[in-house]
């Protein structure tokens, strides 16, 4: 892939990551959300083949709006298929900086042992894997994807009381659903899904993540 195309891809991927962090409630500046390709080139370079930028230059650290101590890393490993050695390096950095959550943007996936290590480290350390291909577009901006809102525990309690329901009576959504992964929704959380409706203005459904 030539430098121009690769620079464009890295810009798109990082832009989606910034939107994802923002949508999860982390503090991202408007400038970062609106960064143009020209601004990306000026900041990081436009010769990936010569290490400008290297993928590691794109690392992001964000803090949550509600709790500045709740921080999240986004790592961009250099190697196409990520092995356990890289995961250990990331985990060590997270331990040193007292950060328990990270996203890893991979080019071609992970080795089986690296994948298993993510499972073994949870729930103390939550590392989520995204293929860069998934991040070239922001799935939540697709016109066919309705708005998803993660509900607080208080909102869920109120919802169940209002409709006299038990949580296990709610319809389900899989934790591996692409939109659920985008928002980092965990099993047991409830999502409010808002669709436009010609008759009612909007149509709301609720889903329990499983």
Swiss-Prot record:
GO terms for molecular function: DNA binding; DNA-directed RNA polymerase activity. Keywords: Acetylation, DNA-directed RNA polymerase, Isopeptide bond, Nucleus, Transcription, Ubl conjugation. The keyword Transcription applies. The modification N-acetylmethionine is found at residue 1. HAMAP family: RNApol_Rpo5_RPB5. Component of the RNA polymerase I (Pol I), RNA polymerase II (Pol II) and RNA polymerase III (Pol III) complexes consisting of at least 13, 12 and 17 subunits, respectively. Pol I complex consists of a ten-subunit catalytic core composed of POLR1A/RPA1, POLR1B/RPA2, POLR1C/RPAC1, POLR1D/RPAC2, POLR1H/RPA12, POLR2E/RPABC1, POLR2F/RPABC2, POLR2H/RPABC3, POLR2K/RPABC4 and POLR2L/RPABC5; a mobile stalk subunit POLR1F/RPA43 protruding from the core and additional subunits homologous to general transcription factors POLR1E/RPA49 and POLR1G/RPA34. It is found in: Nucleus; Nucleus, Nucleolus. There is a cross-link at residue 81 (Glycyl lysine isopeptide (Lys-Gly) (interchain with G-Cter in SUMO2)). It comes from Pongo abelii. SUPFAM superfamilies: Eukaryotic RPB5 N-terminal domain (SSF53036), RPB5-like RNA polymerase subunit (SSF55287). Pfam families: RNA_pol_Rpb5_C, RNA_pol_Rpb5_N. DNA-dependent RNA polymerase catalyzes the transcription of DNA into RNA using the four ribonucleoside triphosphates as substrates. Common component of RNA polymerases I, II and III which synthesize ribosomal RNA precursors, mRNA precursors and many functional non-coding RNAs, and small RNAs, such as 5S rRNA and tRNAs, respectively. Pol II is the central component of the basal RNA polymerase II transcription machinery. Pols are composed of mobile elements that move relative to each other. GO terms for cellular component: nucleus; RNA polymerase I complex; RNA polymerase II, core complex; RNA polymerase III complex. It comes from the Eukaryota. This is DNA-directed RNA polymerases I, II, and III subunit RPABC1. GO terms for biological process: transcription by RNA polymerase II; transcription elongation by RNA polymerase I; tRNA transcription by RNA polymerase III.
């Amino acid at each position: 892939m030539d430098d121009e195309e690769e620079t464009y891809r890295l810009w798109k991927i990082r832009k989606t990551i910034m939107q994802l962090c923002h949508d999860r409630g982390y503090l991202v500046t408007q400038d970062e959300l609106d960064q143009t390709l020209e601004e990306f080139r000026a900041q990081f370079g436009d010769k990936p083949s010569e290490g400008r930028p290297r993928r590691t230059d794109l690392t992001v650290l964000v803090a949550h709006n509600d709790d500045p101590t709740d921080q999240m890393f986004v790592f961009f490993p250099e190697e196409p298929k990520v092995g356990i050695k890289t995961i250990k390096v990331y985990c060590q950095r997270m331990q040193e900086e007292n950060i328990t959550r990270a996203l890893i943007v991979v080019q071609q996936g992970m080795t089986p042992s690296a994948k298993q290590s993510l499972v073994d480290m949870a729930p103390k350390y939550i590392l989520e894997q995204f293929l860069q291909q998934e991040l070239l577009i922001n799935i939540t901006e697709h016109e066919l994807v309705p708005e998803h809102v993660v509900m607080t525990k208080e909102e869920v309690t109120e919802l169940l009381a209002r409709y006299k329901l038990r949580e296990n009576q709610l319809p389900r959504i899989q934790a591996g659903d692409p939109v659920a992964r985008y928002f980092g929704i965990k099993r047991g959380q409830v999502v409010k899904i808002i669709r436009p409706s010609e008759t009612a203005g909007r149509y709301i459904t609720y889903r329990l993540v499983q």
